[in-house]
Amino acid sequence: MGNTVGAPIVSEYLEDEIGPIVFKKSLGNARFLKTVKAYHSEEGYVVVKIYKKRNTKESLEKYKIMLKEIKDNFNITPSFNIMPYQHFIETDRSGYLIRQYFHNNLYDRLSTRPFLSMIEKKFIAFQLLKALEQSSFKGVFHGDIKSENVLVTTSNWVYLSDFACYKPTFIPEDNPADFSFYFDTSGRRTCYIAPERFYETNRGAPSNNELTPKMDIFSLGCVIAELFLDGFPIFDFSQLLSYRKGEYSPEPIIRQRIQDPNIQTLILHMIQKDPDQRYTPEKYISKWNTVFPQYFSFAHQFIPELMRLENDDRVMCISDKFDEIVDIFKNNSITNLFKSNLNQSTNSNTIGSFRVSTPSSPILISNNNNNNNNNNNNNNNNNNNNNNNNNNNNNNNNNQTTTTTTNTNINTTQQQQQQQQQQQQQLQRPLSKLDDIGKNIANIIYKTEQFVKESDEFDKTDITNIKELNIQTTPTINTSTINRVIQTSKTNTNLDTINENSNNNIGVNRKKVTVVEGLDLFLSVIYTAVKHCQFPSTKVKCVGSLLVRLAEMLDDECRLQKIVPYIMSMISPEQPTLVRVEALRSLAKVLEMVQTFPPSESSIFGQYILPSLSQLSHESTDEIIRIAFAEILPQLATTAKRFLEIAQHYRDPDSEGIMESRKDRAKFRVYDSDLQEVQDQFFNKVSDLLTKDSCNTLKKIILSDIYRLCVFFGRQKTNESVLPLIITFLNDRDWQLRCAFFENIVAVCTVVGAGSLESFIYPCILLALTDEEEFVTEKALSSLSELCSLGLLRKPILLELLVKTSPMLLHPNNWIRYGVVSLIVKICQSLSKADVYCYVKPKLSPFLVNLNGNGNGNAEISDTITESNLIQLLDSPISRESFNKIVKFIARNRINLSSSINSILANDNDNFNGESFNSNGSGGGGNPNLVSSTGGSNRRLRALSNKFFVPNILSASNSSINSTSGDIGSLLSQSTEESLAFLRQMTSIGISDSDQNKIIKCFDYLQSKKCKDLESANNSEGNVIVIRTNGTTIISSSNNSNNNTLSSSTTSSNSTTPTNSTVNLHSVLNNTTIIQQQQQQLQQTITQQSITQQQQQQQQQQQVSGGITTGGTTTTTLGRSSSPQLTGLNPSILSNSNNIQLSSSVVDVTKLPNSIPIRMVKIRGGDQSLNNSTVSLGSVAGGNIITPSTSLSNSNTMVGNNNNNSYNTSTSSSPLSSSVLNSSVGMNNLTNSNANSINNSSGINNNNSNNNSVNSNNYNNMNNNTMNNSVNLMNSNQIGQQQQQNPNTVKIDLVSPSDLNVVSKKYYIRDPKMGLSTILKVETNVECSIKVPLPLPDLGSTDSVLGGGLLSSGGVGGGVGGTGGGNINGVSGINGNVGGGGGGVGVGTVGSGGNGSIGGGNSGINNGSGGGGVNSGGNSGINSGSTNSSGSLYGNGNGLDNLPNSTWRPMGILVSHFFEHKAAVNEIQVSSDNLFFATASNDGTVKIWDCQRMEKSVTNRARQTYAQQEGRITSISICEKTHSIASASDKGSIHVFRVGISGKQKNGNIKYTNLSTVKNITETTRGNIVSVSHYSTNSSSVVTYATTKGGIHGWDLRSQQDAFNLVNDASLGLIQAFLIDPNRNWLVTGTSRGFLTCWDLRFGIPLYSVRVSNGRILKFAPYMLAKSASESWVYISTEQDNVIVFDLSNKKTTRVFKRSYEQPPQQQPQQPQPPQQQQQQQSQMNRSINMTSSTTTTTTSSYDFGTENLKTSSYSQLPSNPLVNSIVNNSNINNNNNNNDNSNNVTIFKPTPLVRALLNPPNCPFLITAGDDKRIKLWDWNNLPQSYYVSIGKEPPPFYTHKFSNDTSNAYEIHEEVWHDTSSSSFYSNSAMFGGGGGGQPMSTSLSSSSLSQQQHQAQLQLQYQLQQQQQQQQYINHLQQQKSKTSISMPTVHHQEPILDIKMMEVPNPMLISASTDGVVKVWK
């Protein structure tokens, strides 16, 4: 190219000379080739090197050929590491070299973070040698290898580029100009040219001017040396010349700076001066195998194939094959693994079949592989000899892997088999032994203790007197659970799961994983793929799983330098939420793995990580991210402190904490300041999360691991900051948050010390003992037990706890009782024996069981108090019912009787110390014993209980209580009046005697117990049911939500009972008029409350409320008292009655208005009760949710009182649900066997028999979706049964979005030695792995019929009609067979056409002959058996190709007449393949008719009849692309049934089998169904229906659930019709008030409502003109205007089709016709009339669309001709003119008939209407005068004209038919005047005097024409009469005699109309 300097390059030249390339910027300052970066519109960024020619004569053709050869060589066989120039262009001025642009070259990459690791440098050197090997193999040599020409991608893949074949091979050594111009492009003066390429000037250049591979080896050696020297070049130009002369050597630098001696020798060998001593690239790779391990070859082949996949597939492939890749890199051997994978993927018989097992499954080797293994061993001998060292080193590693590899000797195989058998035995060994469990738990506790000790050592804090620290360190380990497992064996917890979770979560003794070298090569590949992933799930899997697994096998430097920064980038706000969550968790795991790091990384938390995470604690961050951040905070804090301690150890590894000098103190000051800074940062994060966030879940997460945070903050900061922050959680209403506080507070106590424990934490625990939620109380007791076991409580506090908690031994909750027992045992263990005897035993004695039945004494406790002994001696607890009553009673009335109760319990001999009941705990003088074990006070207390607490005490006055016992009298004399009133009140509210005694013992605890339901009880006074029975009125209030029973007690006339528990009890005992006041207040409340529709509906559904059965017949009675008395009873007061008998004969139930809700049941005593509108089951601790049953309750229920005081409102009670036993909801109900419950069938079940639940079925109104669908909750064992009875019961989510995987891919790694082009095989499986919704029920698809035998295998249609021939009855003009002509369905040839058809001959209509007819019958068959686009069975023959089109018109020829229906036929539907059509009738049947039989004969019968549906069938719809029909009944039911078609009969007719029901949908509550429709999508098959209550509902047949529920506005009127868009985008409804509502089906919202008519909207029809601009147009049949065309998009009317009367204009008198002519015309008319035979058809129609008032009468049937239009009778005109000469022109309103049927055939520019006038009219809107009557109906219409006009004000067209018969009063006239059948053209303008004569002449011609047609028609009628006389069948009428309700069109065998009327008649017309 010459040693010339190029002229300056102008950037504009670029686009002018080489096309669409835009200059971006210059690259470098080279003089020989100017390099620029440019942008190509199609290829992206490119590099263009420009050579500026010196003159235009200079030619570059030689170099162009060389560059093209290089390009072609590498393009034929793709090379992985070569990037040649892609394009070379030569112009007159320049030459251009173009290749792809890369962001980095090797020189730039060496100075870019993250820096290359040693293994990455080796892999780059390996790729460079491979690139040189590839180019040498092609005979191509580079000539200028340097770091600038080595391109590096983001995945660290290397390309060798810029082949310099155009540069000189040899340059002079004494002239640096050539070197600077050609080779020193970067200006660094680095020189990597081989020494032999320099020559002395005096000797001249060598004659051989070609490059050799040895030259490139030297240059590559220099590049590899620069790579390992981190960018330091070993030669510049002067040094290379000195090295050539032997004056300089780079060996010292290489030996000093490169640590690996193998790399040193490799570089020194490659840069030898003698080229003959240099090796080839492949020999360097094989000889230096220690530098280039064997897995490099695998990675070099695997990574390029991986890069060809999509980004998501790359990540999935690495993740799926991660274990195999690890094995390859770990063992440095890939051959055996490749063979295993190859066998698995190809199923080869010559290699052996192995199943590669997962780590959790054993390895199996098939027996038929022995011979193959021998062959493999023989074949592998050579490899073993060559790689003995490697094989020996890798045997141990192979034995430890879980993937099967083929070994080289039999011994190794036997060892593996033995090891596999041992693994199988270990996997099959049970792990449920108690000894193993104890060891596992002990291991957990030991690890926890080790963690605590290490943390305390870090904090320089010693915790004394801690022998066993059973605290929770992770969220999954619960100390109470561990203790419960060790002490008892009653729990069902999976201990293996606990052990597994504990091992996974404790990171102190984490199992070390061996570092696998080389895996970091995939990090860059993964990062590049994840950056451009399409699916967030791929990122989640990569960040959450793949990177963590890689981090476990990489070194610490790689974790900190490469993995942590990338994970931090995935936490940025630009990433999806789930990706950020997984990134946070992975960050904590990876940082915890780091054990060693340089000192500079010690501040990574304070300077990098925490500032980057600062935005996560902000309120705007997603809640799930904040929760994940709170979850990892303790882990991050512990890791941060460990980093600081490791850094401190590096600063002074020998001091061991002894600060002897200033230097040491300075080091520690650095540590303290760094720790303080990090602590402040972490506390700010914790404070922001806890104070700025109201999410309780986040607070629970922090509490679950609060101990590690406390250890991190230290004692001082925990006391000052953390403890006050978490104590505020106790003020929260969420009881689960309070539970979490007490679950984890013990660990905090170990950090804060005894002072903070007694001052702050202990009082909070005492308050929790009386918490309203019993879960909290149980957790508080557990925390006290832990504190006692740790020895953190002093003796006075222990004694105080004994006093406070001993009364709780009588608590009805077993969990609380067991917690108190555990606490007392721990207290006893901390006290001496003397203290136990003096303090503990007296305190416990009153709560022990009474061994002597006469009350002589309680049980005596042994000296050693254990949990088992104490539980056995405890007295039975207070019943749950009594406990709830007394707690609410005390809280509501604020009773404080502590001193009075103590005085009752006191006596002279053995004093009960009052201090035992006081809240100040122990202390004070006196005997601390509560009761002596054998003292007499116990007997007195028993006597007091037996004699004082009796029901008769209520009848006595307060001052006159008599007793026969002197002891009782003395006790009563000491009691106060207030205490006596309290005792009476306990009896009055229904507390038993035994419970009263226990209540007195634990009164102090009950007095301080909080009552959660107090507020709700006070607000429920209005929930009352009034019952009158025999003059006695009982008002029952349901304010007790825990006990919803309703009972009564017999009361005497002199006794009074409280009416409401909110009233003061003293006033209740002395005032009997409170009930009247309550009634007045109740009436006022009722008048103020509004009754909503939802509450009213739900109230009607509830049949049982509080034990009272209401409804149509009430069967509940109450016991009658002796005298009429008004008594108000609380349900809790009534529960103690003994004589309750219910009978329907004596009860008058007055139910209060529905606005007063009646509480039914409560799942848990502390929760809000369930109301009537919704059932909201909150989350519980156990995770199980109790759902009420849906079993129906009996309408007649007997309620009685048994011995257990339980009321059973069904014949049998259900057993306890096993799921409830494991639920935390049952904790409140773990009480004794005394039960007061109501059980309705099977439903809500508590844990034992002592439950206060109401099991009812009145939970049917839970809203499970946005459509307010009524869904019943049911138990899991009842779902199947209930769904069979009522399939609409439960909405089940059948398909989860996460399961809808589109494809699944499997990846296989194959052996590269097999000679395959790729080693990565990807199998994509779409069919087997797609998870779709439930299959659609068998609806009889039309496609299945095609393969079922209806068509021949060749697809050629047969002839149904057969050949024509013969005349019918010899009548001329009707030639051919009636059914002849037209091919049909079946095997055979296309049937030949007959000689014409009906109406043929010389009629002038269709002069067809031979193959003629209406539609050339011979061509109407199947054309080659193909199907049309609409899914029809019929082919694209001429008969269907032209159907329907703009030229087709119905002729009005009657083909068939059916009269099988006994009532009105409401709707007709034709199947999509035109095999059959169906009719729905008011007689409750749906009949199926065969379309193929229509032209065979007039008399046909229905093929099938469906009569299994109740009520009238109002609408039907044929399911799309199926043979199933959806029929709707006025009873609110929809049946979907399948029409069975099983093939073809011998005569060619289709064979119909039985009908089968597919689905029954019963929606009686939604109203009568007006119309039904069906549509299908790719994922659903929806039956849509509208009801009279304004609902539009969709039921999905595939998922068996509601697809949508829409509600039309009731103010718009009742829905009369609806129509669905064929594209499923919109839906329109029409109402009785003329309103049209358009709905958007995609979003389920109403778009608008507009009034289109003042009358009713009767029907919709789609506008079917193809490819019109009016796709949103619809036809609407209305009352006022017969038919309008409405544009839904513009909300306006575009056309109107109407009929009206018009007053005739004034006309000149006409000359009368001669009498002879009048008589002649009249005689002709009479003859034409007499030619017809009249039939009478009468019926009683009950059709509900407005035809109930239509009169049915006998009338004469007139003949008709379809093409003769209405004509005028001249005599009639004259008579009208004569009669109207002297009359006044008065316009009288005359009603027009309603249009009830609309039809717009596809692609036809006309509309067909029918309705109350019994006529079928065709409206041609393109040519209105061409409109005519297809059927003239019962009587001919009068004279009419067509009128077209434009309404300019409303902008729509009016197509009007104007009637001029002024003598007729309405369209329902019974005159016998003949008006014409329809063959002629009607008058298109109104009459005028100037055109009267012309009209008369036209009328005469039309009359003659009509008479001729009537003669031909009469011949056909005569033929039918003859057939009638032969078959004794009544002659059918030609036209409809009743209003027509529907018309449809079928296309096969010929296009024909189907019409149906209210008398049940169905007619088919040509």
UniProtKB/Swiss-Prot annotation:
Name of the protein described by the UniProt record: Probable serine/threonine-protein kinase vps15
Active-site annotation: D144
Enzyme class, spelled out: transferase
InterPro entries: ARM-like, ARM-type_fold, HEAT_type_2, Kinase-like_dom_sf, Prot_kinase_dom, Ser/Thr_kinase_AS, Vps15-like, VPS15-like_hel
Gene symbol of the encoding locus: vps15
HEAT repeat locations: 558-596, 604-642, 717-754, 756-793
Family designation: Belongs to the protein kinase superfamily. Ser/Thr protein kinase family.
Pfam family, one: WD40
Listed GO MF terms: ATP binding; protein serine kinase activity; protein serine/threonine kinase activity
